[in-house]
From Swiss-Prot:
Chain residues carrying a lipid of type N-palmitoyl cysteine: 20
Listed name of the protein: Nisin immunity protein
Keyword terms: Bacteriocin immunity, Cell membrane, Lipoprotein, Membrane, Palmitate, Signal
GO biological process, one term: bacteriocin immunity
Disulfide feature: none
Entry function: Involved in immunity against exogenously supplied nisin.
Coiled coil start-end: none
Span of the signal peptide: 1-19
Domain of life, per lineage: Bacteria
Membrane topology annotation: Lipid-anchor
Length: 245
């Protein structure tokens, strides 16, 4: 009986050691001062500039999370953001449908390759991403002339009837937290004091009015924030696209 107990303890110890080794063996560790080069599975890899469509991304191989702030000009890592920096949120390594590997970066997926292929394939470029100031220094504002539009970074975005699914939603950006009643044709906001009034001809003014409860704003996976984003309207997320595109 004693031998049996000793054998069980020994087996548990071996299993525990192998489990710990497997976990550490698969960790992702970025090279010091680099946002593209890293170690995975005891091998050197780099993040390429080749984007993988979301529909081609399958299961995750290893889960991790890392936030890096990179200066756009010097490409040096920073401890805090500035007006010329890019914030990269790197998380998880995935297997693609063709069995290649990719990494999640800012709601997109970029192919990773062994470091030996670096001369033949371009590494990830910071130009693929918005500078930090584009997101943090400007607020989303409902247009004062048309409640169906959003003013962001000096550009106008039109809110469409197209629904954005939960799977398409990217990172949280802002919240509007406002209710507006506006003319259904012109989009002009109607003052709260006039919401319940009756028109001179006796018809109910609400018949040509629309009420929107504005909520959160999210980026959309695979799209630049300056191109389009999702706005929560009456508990559904609607697509807002840049006017003039």
């Amino acid at each position: 009986m004693r031998r049996y107990l000793i054998l069980i303890v020994a087996l548990i110890g071996i299993t525990g050691l192998s489990g710990c080794y497997q976990t550490s063996h698969k960790k992702v560790r970025f090279d010091e001062g680099s946002y593209t080069n890293f170690i995975y599975d005891n091998k050197s890899y780099f993040v390429t500039d080749k984007e993988i469509p979301q529909e081609n991304v399958n299961n995750s191989k290893v889960k991790f999370y890392k936030l890096l702030i990179v200066d756009m000009k010097s490409e040096k890592l920073l401890s805090s953001s500035n007006k010329n920096s890019v914030t990269l949120v790197l998380n998880n390594i995935y297997e693609a449908s063709d069995k290649s590997l990719c990494m999640g970066i800012n709601d997109r997926y970029y192919k990773i390759l062994p470091e030996s292929d670096k001369g033949a394939v371009k590494a990830l470029r910071l130009q693929n991403f918005d500078v930090t100031s584009d997101i943090s220094d400007d607020n989303f504002v409902i247009d004062k002339n048309d409640s169906r539009k959003i003013d962001y970074m000096g550009n106008i975005y039109s809110i469409s009837d197209t629904t954005v699914s939960d799977e398409e939603l990217g990172e949280y950006q802002d919240v509007l937290a406002e209710v507006r009643v506006f003319d259904s044709v012109s989009g002009k906001s109607i003052p709260r004091s006039e919401w319940g009034r009756i028109d001179k001809d006796g018809s109910n003014s609400k018949q040509s009015r629309t009420e929107w409860d504005y909520g959160e704003i999210h980026s959309i996976r695979g799209k630049s924030l300056t191109e389009a984003f999702a706005v929560e309207i009456n508990d559904d997320f609607k697509l807002a696209t840049k006017v003039g595109n």
